[in-house]
Amino acid sequence: MELGAATVCVTAVCFNFLVAYSSSPLTLSILSSSICLDDFLGEGVPSVGLFFMEVKNLAKVACLGFLPAEEGNEDDINNGNLDFKGRADERRQPVSNLRM
């Protein structure tokens, strides 16, 4: 039963991550805490934090795949020139585009 409850908790946190995608970093840091998993799996489980960070990273990748970019064009998206919010990041332009 504890494992099922933890699964529900992880699912809820992943859903909340999707909802709070464009929220403040404080909201995301609250959602990324592993308190919820610790409540179900108990204290002293050494890999809970690492497991939760992996789940959070997978959710982040899923979010980037499904949410539309706010700015930028298709070339920026395909070349990885977008920041976390989907905006074009001028700092990551190819060297040939930089002016000397």
Swiss-Prot record:
This is Putative uncharacterized protein YDL163W. The lineage of its organism: Eukaryota, Fungi, Dikarya, Ascomycota, Saccharomycotina. Residues 78-100 are annotated as: Disordered. Residues 84-93 have a biased composition (Basic and acidic residues). It comes from Saccharomyces cerevisiae (strain ATCC 204508 / S288c). Partially overlaps CDC9.
